[in-house]
Amino acid sequence: MAQADIALIGLAVMGQNLILNMNDHGFVVCAFNRTVSKVDDFLANEAKGTKVVGAQSLKDMVSKLKKPRRVILLVKAGQAVDDFIEKLVPLLDTGDIIIDGGNSEYRDTTRRCRDLKAKGILFVGSGVSGGEEGARYGPSLMPGGNKEAWPHIKAIFQAIAAKVGTGEPCCDWVGDEGAGHFVKMVHNGIEYGDMQLICEAYHLMKDVLGMRHEEMAQAFEEWNKTELDSFLIEITANILKYRDTDGKELLPKIRDSAGQKGTGKWTAISALEYGMPVTLIGEAVFARCLSSLKEERVQASQKLKGPKVVQLEGSKKSFLEDIRKALYASKIISYAQGFMLLRQAATEFGWTLNYGGIALMWRGGCIIRSVFLGKIKDAFERNPELQNLLLDDFFKSAVDNCQDSWRRVISTGVQAGIPMPCFTTALSFYDGYRHEMLPANLIQAQRDYFGAHTYELLTKPGEFIHTNWTGHGGSVSSSSYNA
């Protein structure tokens, strides 16, 4: 007899925790795993005493579901998702729903959405953020795909999502086809940026200010009471305080080679594809790439010279406040760039995205959760057509208030030989964005000189002109040479 409200396939820790979360909110969940013994183990241990039911096969699982059947896939992105979909489709009926909760590439989600729509199956690709803890007690959920599915999953999704403010769920419908997974991808890219910015602040504290771990931990704890209040600042303070079994700080013992799963890279690639200068996330990805060259860096450190020791001007306390302001200003730039990419993607794919709603989805439950996101939500509520966060009065004023500190930090860091790829690219973007005239006119002249690519005059927009710069060429308007 059909009794389960929803099924979940994939009993790794995330899957188990999401099932227990749904159970806590009164939903009956059917659990399935490719290795069936894992279902029995889960029911006998973590799910003991709950209403969770198990299935011994996909057919058994489908038979236990109320209609329309709702199935969440929480398996490795890629071929595994397609394999399960292929096995599920013959067992499902028109109007049934498959939900992919993994970190799938948004184009795959769009393809699956279209393929399944032709077969009468409703497909949803949902970003799920917050890690194992979030899955258990309230993640940020970013569903997109076939909107006909939303009324049938909304109650479950919004019940289990993190809550902020007066109980607003960090979950709402994002948009058509791959929109949900695109938004999750950008979220992950911003996460890369936030983490790298914090690392650069830590590097400056350690090597310019010579702060001890307990001093740095205290600084981050204080910062967490300001506009930087966020999950990542909070855990950074905890990491700096943490001591190993020998009583010494653990952090200095950790190999300085950062891993990555690829979603930051996807964001940077998408930015290039859609012509958006999402420079900070790109630099955050490259910083991890550089960190992975550990052996080369060890050799280079013995051969390549840097600047002499720089004497810090002013007090350590005032420079620490400068670092805080530089971090805040750079963070604003990162989010401004992320939302630029979302806006461009919406134009490319015809999505109707609620940018304030997206900020709310990220406000709780996820890795980038912060008070700061509430300010972004407010900005888009004031002006839903806001072209760039930097043009909102609140953020314009915030950056202006931080600007002198930001420039001092970068100047001091450069003179001290501290790598600050994200601090510096953030300021470069800000300066570029606020310039009415950039030297790109010279690039256009160069392109026309060697490739006859033409240019426009400021006084004649829309009219493309080629100049015979040497007197030897013809007056062709373009050539096969591109740059």
Curated annotation (Swiss-Prot):
Its EC number is 1.1.1.44. The modification N6-acetyllysine is found at residues 38, 59. Substrate binds at residues 103, 129-131, 187-188, 192, 261, 288, 447, 453. Keywords: Acetylation, Cytoplasm, Gluconate utilization, NADP, Oxidoreductase, Pentose shunt, Phosphoprotein. Pathway: Carbohydrate degradation; pentose phosphate pathway; D-ribulose 5-phosphate from D-glucose 6-phosphate (oxidative stage): step 3/3. The keyword Cytoplasm applies. It is found in: Cytoplasm. The active site is at residues 184, 191. Belongs to the 6-phosphogluconate dehydrogenase family. This is 6-phosphogluconate dehydrogenase, decarboxylating.
